[in-house]
């Protein structure tokens, strides 16, 4: 491995881990698609976090990656979903999961969906970053409880109706 500078090394690490996540998500989408043509919101939300969680369970280097870079999407001033996409995050499998999620959430217009997906990326990034720093973070019942609680939170985040207050402010800002 020859990199001209530290930035090049960091980008290579991020692209490698992103590719691993995309591949794992693609496997999970294929398994889900073979099971049902209309997955639940919970099953789709699981696609947002379970690939990274499983990789962290299986791979020490991936856990180190989460510890080192998990905070980056939290601290961005830009859309964290767009930032993740611009760094190779998501890929084809991420676009598939996003498309499935949009279809399952007809109550959200494009702007509301974008606000929710940004909040979801921040929630997942924060949660995984914190979890990676815990003892036995990705093994045992406590780790499974973490995963299922995070998926529950994502389901709530996406399933909630847009409040009249939020809609009024969104309309005002158009």
Question: Model-found features: residue ranges?
Answer:
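Residue-level detector of well-ordered alpha-helical segments, enriched
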Residues: 13, 40, 44, 48, ...
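Short alpha-helical scaffolding segments that buttress acidic/His motifs in well-ordered protein cores
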Residues: 48, 52, 66-73, 120-124, ...
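Amphipathic, non-transmembrane alpha-helical scaffold segments
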Residues: 10, 14, 18, 83-90, ...
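Hydrophobic alpha-helical connector segments
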Residues: 23-66
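An amphipathic alpha-helix adjacent to DNA-recognition modules
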Residues: 2-26, 30
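Amphipathic alpha-helical packing segments from all-alpha helical-bundle domains
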Residues: 42-46, 61-64, 73-105
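C-terminal peripheral helix-coil segments that are non-catalytic and often amphipathic
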Residues: 91-174
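Secondary-structure edge/capping motif, primarily at the C-terminal ends of alpha-helices
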Residues: 28, 32, 73-76, 131-135
């Amino acid at each position: 491995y020859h990199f001209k500078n530290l930035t090049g090394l960091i980008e290579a690490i991020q692209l490698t881990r992103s590719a691993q996540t995309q591949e794992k998500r693609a496997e999970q989408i294929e398994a889900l698609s073979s099971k049902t043509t209309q997955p639940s919101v919970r099953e789709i939300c699981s696609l947002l976090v379970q690939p990274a969680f499983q990789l962290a369970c299986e791979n020490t280097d991936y856990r180190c990656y989460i510890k080192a870079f998990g905070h980056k999407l939290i601290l961005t001033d830009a859309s964290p979903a767009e930032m993740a996409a611009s760094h190779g995050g998501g890929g084809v499998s991420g676009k598939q999961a996003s498309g499935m999620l949009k279809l399952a959430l007809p109550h959200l217009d494009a702007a509301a969906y974008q606000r929710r997906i940004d909040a979801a990326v921040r929630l997942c990034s924060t949660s995984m970053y914190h979890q990676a720093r815990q003892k036995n973070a990705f093994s045992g019942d406590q780790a499974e409880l973490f995963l299922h609680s995070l998926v529950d939170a994502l389901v709530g985040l996406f399933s909630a109706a847009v409040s009249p207050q939020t809609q009024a402010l969104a309309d005002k800002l158009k």
